[in-house]
Amino acid sequence: MENKNKQLGLVSRPPVIVVLGHIDHGKTTLLDYIRKTKIAEEESGGITQHIGAYEIEVVEKGKEKKGETLHSTQDDFSTVSRKITFIDTPGHEAFAKMRSRGAKVADIAILVVAADEGVKLQTKESLKIIQEAGIPFIVAITKIDKPTANLEKVKNELTEAGVLLEKRGGNVPWVGVSSKTGQGIDELLELIILLAEMQDLKANPNNPALGIVIESRLDRFRGNTATLIITNGILRLKDDIIAGKVKGKVKILENFQGKAIKEATFSAPVRVVGFENLAPVGEAFFAGKTEIEIVKPVIKSQKIVKELGKKDSEIRIPLIIKSDTFGSSEALEEIIEQLGKENGWAFLILKNEVGDISESDFKIIPSEKTLIIGFRVKKKPEVNNLLLANKNLVLVEGNLIYEIKDKLEEIVKQKFIEKPTEEILGKIEVLAIFNPIKGNQLIGGKVLEGKIQNKNNFYLMRAETKISQGKVINLQKNRAEVLEAKEGEDCGLLVSGAKRQIEKGDLLVFFKKI
């Protein structure tokens, strides 16, 4: 096998690790400790809003030499110093797509579970992503330094979730860690290196680069920027590059720390400037010295590019989304889809783009009331005047997914939904028709729901269609006059005002004005 690898030009490559788990279970703090840096500063609200990728170097225990830095070589991952690339994915459920894409590029996953909280919904979602990706994983039980930490409870919950840990009848490795004291961190890194060696990860440093786009954004100063994980070959400055249907040339190449470099190889995370358009997140990229010919995607002119929520809803809300990255755009679509289904609304997406809100966004807005979402973007100067001039435009801005969702729900309820003017009190099915009394209709029926009272108004419904309305002038039960009849009770009604003859099988819906 070793000779065959040499013939093919294959050498060992560092593993790519994805970290998954429930929100606030310590993923970013864990990586921050491992890197011994403060790169992972908290973003607004304490949620990491974008996938980041970081590379660390681990010196094999007992091989350190004072004053000497030991480096791994491309030809042998199993030297005294090993590189490991981490992908840090957000914990909020809205970023499920980004987590899923992160898992696909990874060789090993770390499932983070807090010792004081145990298995949560997003823990199970993360586990499902790992299993679907078919990659080995390690369970890191975090926050073991907390007084409320309960490792046995967590391990039992993991067993219930189908995770069979080592020494508990399974083969899933686990380790308790503390990002506060550093306990268990070395053991975790050793487990990663062990799993990587077992997988025998190989790549060819002489090939043109290929890999995955894990983030894409528009930098207002530098242009289209993409974060890439290289899975094979070598990427160089001035290489031609293509991802999906988007091509470009590597004009700027930086490592994960933002330092300019001339080349990078597997499994390095790099930042590239030079794509002609935003590179699609989750798409494979290819690079090389020869120009890559590609037909630019034709942007079709469509009034509605996507419909989210309840497709057959009577409440249909036109919507434009402007955000800072592709990842954010997808996350917003997830939230909008969920909000629509929860409330029975349909959101008609007219545009979903990365970039600031500008005058051009208003050219596609229909005459009816329309929502514009601005997520972590700015408004061009002319936008405020356009908003003032058009009362049908409603702008929702924010820096947090939660914030956008709450604002969106509140505004839709306030401005897009007609408030009910009536309250339904009860319903009666007509079971019998009697001779009229002084021109008023006399009927018998059963209260199907709610309750009805003497003097209540009602709608006469036939075949689910409102055909007339009237009023109760006398209500009886067992031939005795009463003030009300409740659900399940039989009653007799003398009604007036109905311009259509009431028939057996009709439905009377009783209401009052609000």
What is the predicted role of each segment?
Residues 145-206, 346-353, 361, 366-405:
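Canonical P-loop GTPase G-domain recognition
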Residues 225-241, 431-479:
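Charge-patterned, long linear interaction tracts outside catalytic cores
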Residues 5, 198-215, 289-316, 408-430:
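Long, charged amphipathic helices and adjacent flexible linkers at domain junctions
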Residues 93, 104-124, 133-152, 318, ...:
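Conserved Switch II/interswitch segment of TRAFAC-class P-loop GTPases
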Residues 15, 43-67, 75-108, 115, ...:
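Switch I (G2) and immediately adjacent beta-strands of P-loop GTPase domains
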Residues 4, 232-236, 240-370, 485-514:
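Catalytic P-loop NTP-binding/switch module of NTPases
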Residues 2-62, 82-86, 226-232, 239-242:
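Conserved G1/Walker A P-loop phosphate-binding module
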Residues 37, 91-93, 115-119, 143-148, ...:
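Conserved nucleotide-binding/hydrolysis micro-motifs of P-loop NTPases
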